[in-house]
């Protein structure tokens, strides 16, 4: 759904990059990380539907708590090159065979 503001989206969704996406810790279910706002991942718990409950956004001080990650220009704590991709890789890297690589 295209949106101009949060008012254009259903409850539990927010307007991000002109799309209505699921907010962090919303009751809405997700099937992939693309359903969630940027920096938030969709996590499944057993056979339950997925929830956008894994937050990888940078803290306000810009210092990520995991030493394998750093705050990138998209304001996401992304895993550095050569690190296992337990979450999003930093901007410019992609997850290949379980490792963040260029």
Swiss-Prot record:
The keyword Iron does not apply. Disulfide bonds: none annotated. GO terms for cellular component: extracellular region. It comes from the Eukaryota. It is found in: Secreted. GO terms for molecular function: ion channel regulator activity; toxin activity. Contains 8 disulfide bonds. Keywords: Disulfide bond, Ion channel impairing toxin, Neurotoxin, Secreted, Toxin. Expressed by the venom duct. Acts as a neurotoxin by inhibiting an ion channel. The cysteine framework is C-C-C-C-C-C-C-C-C-C-C-C-C-C-C-C. This is Turripeptide OL55-like. It comes from Lophiotoma acuta. The lineage of its organism: Eukaryota, Metazoa, Spiralia, Lophotrochozoa, Mollusca.
